[in-house]
Amino acid sequence: MMGNSAKKVATCAERAKAVNYSPPAFKYNLELQKDVMPLLIAPEKTALLVIDMQNLFTEPGAPLAAPDGPQVVVQINKLVDYCRAHNIPIIWVQETNRKDGSDMGMMAKHWKILAPPDSMLAEGSHWWELYPELHNEPTDIYVKKPKYNAFWGSDLEAVLRSLGIESLIFTGIAFDVCVYTTLIDAFHRDFNPVIAVDATGSPFPYKEASMWHIETLWGRVLTAAEIITELQALAP
C-alpha cells in the first residue's frame, strides 16, 4: 500500500532548480534575421495554414478553449480575407480522431489528462467543427490530421507540393502544441515557415517560450498586419 508515502510530482521549475540549471545568456540577432530572411513570403508560392480552429479550442467555455480565442479569430479572418482576394491558397487543418481514440496512439494517454472523455474530435461532432465565426469557404482546402503534427498521417505535404508552395503562414490554436510541432516539421521538409503571432492562441502558458524558440531556430515571427504588408510589397 502506498498510503501517505506517495511523493508529489516535481514541476519542471523544481527539477531545474535541483540540478542548478539557469538559462544561458544568449542573444539572437533579429536585425541580421531581417537581412538574410527577407523573402520568405513570395505570394505566388505561399499558402495560409489555419490549424485546429475548432470549437473545442475556440468556443468560449469549451474544455480546451484558448483565452485569446476571440482575438485570434479576428486576426485569422484578416489573413483569410486578404489571401482569398489575392488567390493565395487557404488550408484549414482539423484534428480528426475516432470516437474511441484508437487512432491516437500515445497522444490518447495525454488527452485523458488534458480533456474530458466527451471531448474527442470525432468527425461531425460539435467539438470537431470549425468555429462558426471563421471566414472559411467550401472552395478552400481542408486537411484532416490524427495527431498534433499536421504532416503526420495526412496528405498535407502532397497538397502543398502539388501547388508549388514554398512558404507557409502559420495560424491557429494551440500555438505551443499543434501549430508549433507542424511548423518545426515544415522547416525540416524545407518549407519556409512564418508564424502570425497574433493569429495564434493557446490554452497553455508556453506561448512566449515557443515564440522565442521559433524565432531563434525555425522561422519568422510576425503579426498578421506585418505579414499582409510583406505580401503587398512582394506582390507581382
Where would I find each of the regions flagged by the language model?
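Short, conserved beta-strand edge motifs with alternating hydrophobic and charged residues
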Residues: 50, 91-94, 144-145
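Short beta-strand segments at enzyme active-site cores
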Residues: 88-100, 196
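Active-site-adjacent betaalpha module
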Residues: 2-47, 78-86, 104, 111-236
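Short acidic/His/Gly/Ser-rich catalytic and metal-binding motifs that mark active-site loops
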Residues: 56-59, 100-102
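Acidic/histidine-rich helix-loop elements
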Residues: 20-26, 58-69
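Glycine-rich, phosphate-binding/catalytic loops in enzymes
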Residues: 64-68, 108-109, 187-188
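A short alpha/beta connector and helix-capping loop motif
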Residues: 44, 62-83, 87-92
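Acidic-leg catalytic submotif of subtilisin-like serine proteases
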Residues: 47-57
